[in-house]
Amino acid sequence: MMNVSRPAIHPVDALPVAPTAGAIDRPPVRMKDVQGMPGTTGGLILRLSQFVPALISVSVMVTTSDFRSATAFCCLVLAVSLQSLWSLSLFIIDAYALLVRRSLRNHSVVQCFTIGDGVTSTLTFAAASASAGITVLINDLGQCNVNHCTRFETATAMAFISWFAVSPSFILNFWSLATH
């Protein structure tokens, strides 16, 4: 048999490294906030981009005289009203957090934002889809001269835009919640 060398492990004592001057006073390293998260400028812009189309959708739908004729349109008004109130309240919270330079990366806060975004986005999408179906039906039946088809289409489109703007907020909050 050949004499083959075998690796040997020799433990080496690691000497402790003394902290340098000022390292103790330095705050711990924190990851940067991802833009779009609560308490960031991107989050503030996302909340504003959710609020404005939702407010336009509610305003356009409520100014029509016959939106109560279909349950889907009433549902759209309720869902988008909830979306606009939710987005406005979170816009105010984000603006306050930016003004006082406070982080909103608390687990409970992110969980509340995630659940709220999930509920409001689901309601808005469902109501916008139902309203789109009723609007297409009214168009196909040739009843646009009696109804306000253009207003219904505008309100439905604004609801979809508002839902589309809520999606990044929900995904970022959910991601933050999952990695927290």
Curated annotation (Swiss-Prot):
Main localization is: membrane
The portions of this protein that span the membrane are 42-62, 73-93, 118-138, 157-177
Where does it localize?
Cell membrane
State a GO cellular component annotated for this protein: plasma membrane
The record lists its disulfide bonds as: none
Pfam (any one): CASP_dom
Provide the membrane-side ranges marked Extracellular in the record.
63-72, 139-156
Keyword annotations for this protein? Cell membrane, Membrane, Transmembrane, Transmembrane helix
Which membrane topology describes this protein? Multi-pass membrane protein
Q: Which residues lie on this side of the membrane: Cytoplasmic?
A: 1-41, 94-117, 178-180
Family from the record: Belongs to the Casparian strip membrane proteins (CASP) family.
On subunit structure and binding partners, the annotation says:
Homodimer and heterodimers.
**Stated name of the protein:** CASP-like protein 5A1
Query: Which organism does this record belong to?
Result: Arabidopsis thaliana (Mouse-ear cress)
